[in-house]
């Protein structure tokens, strides 16, 4: 009875949008109590292992849903470029990099996700863990994002690629050497140099 009472006193943080079943259990919620929170419309079940906190009051960002639906996913390409303010383009879905041959069983109805299959090396380079209040997601760092876009310039669009690289080069914190290192590892150093010769 004492353990049950202690668990009932646990509350959800209004600053965390998505909870995993494991997180809820660590907070002291039983499966029965989690079901009650769903019935009370305090939680919405997203999939077998994650729930959305209806009482979330933080700044909304659809990136917070990605770990629930694509645990190994990394925000990439145009979605990452938007995050770093490198483009005025607004994609209608979130670009997420995943391992080759990765299969996913469920997607959210409210969030559009575009999967991009990356090799093991490309997926492991330049990954950042971003934490905002009690929410987190993975995204490639800004230089890796630029190099990935150059590699995928035909898919992204030549004008969009030029805009993104131009905006990156205008930043005071730009790191050309880091661009070169990524480009060399990902076999697009020649095309990067061609762009830089024109833009610098």
Question: Which role does the model predict for each range below?
Answer:
Residues 2-4, 71:
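Conserved functional hotspots at enzyme active or ligand-binding sites that engage polyanionic ligands
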Residues 4-19:
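Short amphipathic alpha-helical interface segments
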Residues 16-23, 38, 52-200:
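Nucleic-acid-binding surface
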Residues 26-39:
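Short amphipathic alpha-helical interaction segments
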Residues 42-48:
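A short, conserved structural fragment
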